């Protein structure tokens, strides 16, 4: 969308001190409204979990884990996207300790390596990873507690998420407020985010809650999703999904639908009438190809391409309602409610954005990196350019250094979202932060 009158406009946002403050205010503002939609079995309908229940589950889990001596410790979380994964993450955010999200796709040896490097005392894991965790455990040092995030295993060494929730509720009903009353230091080390390691050993990016909420707060001035329903597709251990979708979505009152998996994206969008989806270029390019393949198979490709061309020339992307009527079959296949497709993680082919917009699916992209929590620049949802990453976020400064004759050089940035440094790597920190 490219409504120029919004070029320099900001949405109004409320101040937040830390992630605990954010969720407390969300529970007050949005209490009974759904925060999450989850599905335990494929053929079952999605079930809503309210903002109030989300807050209570965080307090219960945190109270239970704190009673087990985990206050101030590092807690690793690994598993597929799930509500329980998010609750464990925010229990750490409420003051329990340092959170260490880990990629479930890594081999057992690398998972053990990251657990050991982080000094994690607790591992919260998905039952689906049970066999891999059995390989991991003999390779780890320092783990004091295991938590089965979604299983029925109940024993002293490996309590289940549900057992801990009930245990925490009992402790709170008996007057235990040790966890509830923790005051969070927004400047303290909170999250250890391991990079992909594509350039060698994975680096541990150290984040404070101030780093993260600065990203949430400033991004919300450009993009508004309140009252919408978003599909959580990307892995939650990624800063992009966690900060931009989960945190920012909750801050604004989004209903987050936990996707059943990549092969269920379209069916989940349609079933839940999803309006917002964050993804990487590969996802959106695949969806785009699927639409065109279907049109070709139905003998409608020429008609679709001509309609896209006319829509673009007439700038109908500023009038999604008209586009929705022209491309009604495509909109019907996606539930008829899409208001935002947001791409990140890498540059996307601008034609994909232009085609989606011409069909009445507002779409834009941003730019960032884990070390900046992650967003550095992002298009405004009401004024965007298909071939640009967007303006720099409020509070962030960007420079290009060592530029060549064409102006291409290294991008450096400064702002409240810039990481604290690399974990146990003073040399790399000095090279990155000047």
Question: Over which residues does each language-model region extend?
Answer:
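Structural core segment of the AMP-binding/adenylate-forming
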Residues: 22, 94-167
């Amino acid at each position: 969308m490219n409504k120029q009158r919004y070029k320099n406009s900001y949405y109004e946002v409320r101040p937040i001190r830390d992630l605990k403050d954010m969720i407390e205010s969300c529970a007050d503002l949005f209490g009974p409204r759904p925060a999450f939609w989850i599905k335990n079995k494929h053929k079952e309908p999605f079930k809503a979990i309210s903002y109030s229940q989300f807050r209570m589950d965080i307090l219960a889990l945190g109270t239970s884990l704190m009673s087990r001596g985990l206050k101030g410790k590092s807690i690793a979380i690994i598993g597929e996207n799930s509500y329980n994964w998010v609750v464990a993450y925010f229990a750490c955010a409420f003051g329990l300790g340092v959170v260490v999200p880990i990629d479930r796709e890594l081999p057992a040896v690398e998972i053990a390596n990251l657990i050991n490097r982080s000094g994690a005392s607790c591992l919260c894991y998905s039952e689906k990873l049970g066999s891999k965790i059995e390989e991991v455990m003999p390779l780890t040092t320092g783990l004091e507690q295991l938590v089965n995030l979604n299983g029925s295993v109940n024993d002293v060494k490996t309590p289940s998420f549900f057992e801990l929730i009930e245990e925490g509720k009992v402790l709170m009903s008996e007057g235990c407020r040790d966890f509830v009353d923790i005051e969070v230091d927004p400047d303290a080390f909170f999250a250890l985010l391991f990079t992909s390691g594509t350039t060698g050993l994975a680096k541990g990016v150290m984040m404070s809650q101030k780093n993260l909420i600065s990203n949430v707060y400033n991004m919300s001035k450009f993009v508004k999703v309140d009252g919408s329903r978003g599909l959580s597709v990307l892995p939650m251990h990624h800063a992009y999904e966690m900060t931009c979708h989960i945190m920012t979505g909750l801050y604004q009152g989004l209903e987050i639908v936990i996707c059943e998996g990549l092969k269920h994206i379209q069916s989940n969008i349609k079933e839940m009438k999803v309006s917002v989806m964050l993804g990487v270029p590969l996802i959106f390019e695949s969806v785009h190809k699927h639409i065109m393949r279907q049109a070709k198979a139905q003998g409608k490709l020429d008609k679709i391409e001509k309609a896209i061309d006319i829509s673009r020339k007439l700038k109908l992307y500023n009038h999604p309602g008209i586009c929705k009527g022209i491309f009604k079959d495509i909109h019907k296949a996606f539930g008829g409610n899409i208001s935002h497709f947001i791409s990140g993680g890498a540059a996307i082919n601008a034609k994909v954005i232009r085609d989606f917009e011409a069909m009445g699916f507002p779409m834009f992209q941003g730019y960032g990196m884990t070390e900046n929590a992650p967003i550095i620049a992002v298009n405004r949802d009401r004024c965007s350019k298909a071939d640009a990453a967007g303006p720099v976020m409020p509070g962030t400064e960007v420079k290009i250094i060592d530029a060549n004759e064409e102006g291409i050089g290294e991008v450096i940035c400064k702002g409240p979202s810039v990481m604290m440094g690399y974990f146990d790597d003073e040399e790399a920190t000095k090279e990155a932060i000047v």
